[in-house]
């Protein structure tokens, strides 16, 4: 059975989301500026994790409305929940606004509209923070970069599955990131299937209990009817016994009458003899 995971990337505009997706998809870093990642014309990628083959589809939430204007008010995410298995929430480690918006803007909307979908937080452009990659090794202040520990704290605050960092330029950390996304997304699918199975089982149990209750009620009614019939039979038997007793009494009375008649007859006969 095919295992498919849909990954939706969200985050502020112009921070390198599309470049990250294209670098991972093509395995090449391109300095071309992309407006957005059009996944409609791209085939899903296959990743193999512990002998499990998972197909991942990459989708970018570009944040633009139908007129091509960047949206300034919610909803910022355009996809329906049934089209998403996991969110990849991105910020640039050189852009503190994009970092802060992970909490105040993107996480807020995810929790409001997609509460059951897991989130993986990732800081990109880590090459800018590495001393050897500073432009011409000029003295650039590192303090304005988002540190790794800040990223971890943010992940904990928004209840993300984890925090990761990567560099599109160096192609560093990309494979590990998307392997995690594939695992998290597929785990979410399995959880939803288990919940559906539990729901079906609960319904079946309720129907079974209702049927059993109906059967019990029917059996109780039958038993009550049988008891009533038995009582009626007993009453009839009692009546029959009473009738028999009455008959016996009548017979006894008849016998007494016969005896009296016989005695009277004997007396008459005796008297007759005496007269003669």
UniProtKB/Swiss-Prot annotation:
Keywords: Cell membrane, GTP-binding, Lipoprotein, Membrane, Methylation, Nucleotide-binding, Prenylation
UniProt topology in membrane: Lipid-anchor
Cysteine methyl ester: residues carrying this PTM: 273
Spans annotated as Disordered: 199-276
MF GO annotations: GTP binding; GTPase activity; protein kinase binding
Record GO biological process: actin filament organization; cortical cytoskeleton organization; establishment or maintenance of cell polarity; mitotic cytokinesis; regulation of actin cytoskeleton organization; regulation of cell shape; response to bacterium; signal transduction
Prosegment location in residue numbers: 274-276
Subcellular location: Cell membrane
Chief location: membrane
Record PANTHER family: RHO FAMILY GTPASE (PTHR24072)
Listed name of the protein: Rho-related protein racO
């Amino acid at each position: 059975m095919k295992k498919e995971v849909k990954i939706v990337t969200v985050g502020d505009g112009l921070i390198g989301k599309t470049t990250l997706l294209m670098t991972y998809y093509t395995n090449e870093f391109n300095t071309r500026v992309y407006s957005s990642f059009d996944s409609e014309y791209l085939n899903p990628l296959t990743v193999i994790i512990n002998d499990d083959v998972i197909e991942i589809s990459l989708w970018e939430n570009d944040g633009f409305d139908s007129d091509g204007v960047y949206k300034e008010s919610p909803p910022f995410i355009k996809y329906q929940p049934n089209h998403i298995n996991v969110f990849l929430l991105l910020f640039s480690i050189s852009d503190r606004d994009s970092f802060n918006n992970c909490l105040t803007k993107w996480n807020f909307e995810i929790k409001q509209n997609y509460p059951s979908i897991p989130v993986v937080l990732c800081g990109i452009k880590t090459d800018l923070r590495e001393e050897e990659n500073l432009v011409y090794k000029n003295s650039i202040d590192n303090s304005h970069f988002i540190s790794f520990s800040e990223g971890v704290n943010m992940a904990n605050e928004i209840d993300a599955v984890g925090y990761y960092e990567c560099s599109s330029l160096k192609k560093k950390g990309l494979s590990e990131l998307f392997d995690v996304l594939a695992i998290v997304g597929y785990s979410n699918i399995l959880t939803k299937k288990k919940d559906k199975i539990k729901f079906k089982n609960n319904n079946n149990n309720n129907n079974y209990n209702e049927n059993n209750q109906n059967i019990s009620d029917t059996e109780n009614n039958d038993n009550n009817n049988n008891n009533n019939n038995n009582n009626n039979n007993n009453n009839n038997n009692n009546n029959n016994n009473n009738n028999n007793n009455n008959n016996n009494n009548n017979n006894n009375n008849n016998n007494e009458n016969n005896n009296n008649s016989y005695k009277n007859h004997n007396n008459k006969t005796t008297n007759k003899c005496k007269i003669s």
